Design a protein with these regions (language model features):
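Flexible, glycine-rich phosphate/dinucleotide-binding loops
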Residues: 23, 174, 187
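Beta-strand C-termini and the immediately following turn/loop, strongest in propeller blades
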Residues: 147, 159-160, 165-172, 182
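Short, small/polar residue-rich loop motifs at catalytic or cofactor-binding pockets
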Residues: 3, 151-152, 174
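A short loop-to-beta-strand structural motif that recurs across blades of beta-propeller domains
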Residues: 177-179
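Acidic/His/Gly-enriched intrinsically disordered linker/tail segments
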Residues: 1-140
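Multi-bladed beta-propeller domains
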Residues: 126-152, 181-191
Length: 191
């Protein structure tokens, strides 16, 4: 499709095809499902207009890939894989590539805005059902924060005696840092 489409379309298509044409890919993984499930449970499932935007808040740059690829997966599960070629041709054939609802109607028989809203409702319902099912199995452990001033705490390793934790801290403001802390996250120092 044209380069003027929202990022969730271009990146969502690329990510969907990555999975469709290989035995791997992010649509086959669980991370994107988790991103959308978390958003649904927290009341933050993004609208079709929000999914293309950038934000420093989680899931940051992942949103276009996660929302786009799983929305296309939803559309094709519901309306058939053969509709993807029709959608791409419909978008590519437009003088004004922003008319995604028209492309959706001509290829899937529905406007993408309406189908997105239905998909969001379905995602909320499924997430709430899974949440209830898991809660019925017993209490879920609450997470314990071990890092401070970090957007990401990556590659954690615990010392052999269990007293120390070392990890890579990324705060998106400065270079990544190697941090050594007590196993409970206290007394951090940068190495």
């Amino acid at each position: 499709p044209a380069s003027a489409v929202p990022r969730w379309v271009s990146e969502g298509l690329a990510t969907w095809y990555e999975s469709e044409l290989t035995d791997a890919g992010r649509v086959r993984g669980t991370y994107h499902d988790m991103v959308l499930r978390t958003a649904a449970l927290e009341g933050r499932f993004e609208s079709i207009g929000q999914a293309a935007g950038g934000s420093p808040q989680w899931p940051e740059g992942t949103r276009a890939y996660a929302y786009g690829s799983l929305f296309f997966e939803h559309l094709l599960d519901k309306y058939g894989d053969e509709r993807m070629d029709q959608f791409i041709e419909a978008v590519a054939g437009q003088w004004i590539p922003y008319r995604l609802d028209a492309a959706g109607r001509s290829s899937f028989g529905v406007s993408l805005s309406d189908e997105w809203a239905a998909w969001a409702d379905q995602a909320r319902s499924e997430a709430e059902g899974l949440d209830s099912e898991l809660a019925s199995l017993g209490a879920i452990s609450a997470p314990e924060r071990l890092t401070n001033n970090a957007r990401w705490g990556l590659h954690p390793k615990v010392s052999t005696d269990g007293s120390a934790l070392v990890y890579v801290r990324s705060n998106a403001k400065s270079d990544q840092q190697l941090v050594l802390a007590n196993a409970d996250g206290s007394e951090e120092r940068t190495l």
